[in-house]
């Protein structure tokens, strides 16, 4: 994977070495989901009691469009696939510099349309499914 992006460019989000932005892959939608675990504890002759046992799964879904002839190039979504295939959690930082923790790429979806010569797509829509990674060192 040869990711070479310019410094000083407007970055929306960075996942490991990959920078989301107008010059690479701009996402139009970011959906974040946070779960909290409340298992039911059965009680005799009474309603079940809920007990908070801690945070659950966090996930992010990014959806966007790449126009390879305009910005980013035809390789951008393949760069995301290469990053996912490394099998390593990636550090995520938002465009304001906030550290969002380590995340793994669970799925990369791509839809190609508006084709040029040799079947090269002029439009690539993508959806990226991420899940927050918590290693053993994160357990308190």
Language-model features: where?
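Compositionally biased, intrinsically disordered low-complexity segments enriched in polar/Pro/Gly
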Residues: 1-140
């Amino acid at each position: 994977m040869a990711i070479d992006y310019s410094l000083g460019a407007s970055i929306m989000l960075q996942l490991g070495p990959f920078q989301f932005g107008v010059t690479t892959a701009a996402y139009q939608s970011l959906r974040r989901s946070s779960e909290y675990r409340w298992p039911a504890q059965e009680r005799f002759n009474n309603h079940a009691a809920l007990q908070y046992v801690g945070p659950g799964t966090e996930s992010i879904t990014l959806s966007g469009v790449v126009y390879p002839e305009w910005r980013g190039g035809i390789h951008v979504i393949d760069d995301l696939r290469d990053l996912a295939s490394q099998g390593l959690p990636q550090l995520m930082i938002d465009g304001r510099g906030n550290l969002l923790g380590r995340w793994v790429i669970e799925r990369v979806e791509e839809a190609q349309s508006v084709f040029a010569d040799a079947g090269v797509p002029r439009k690539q829509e993508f959806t990226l499914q991420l899940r927050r990674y918590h290693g053993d060192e994160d357990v308190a």
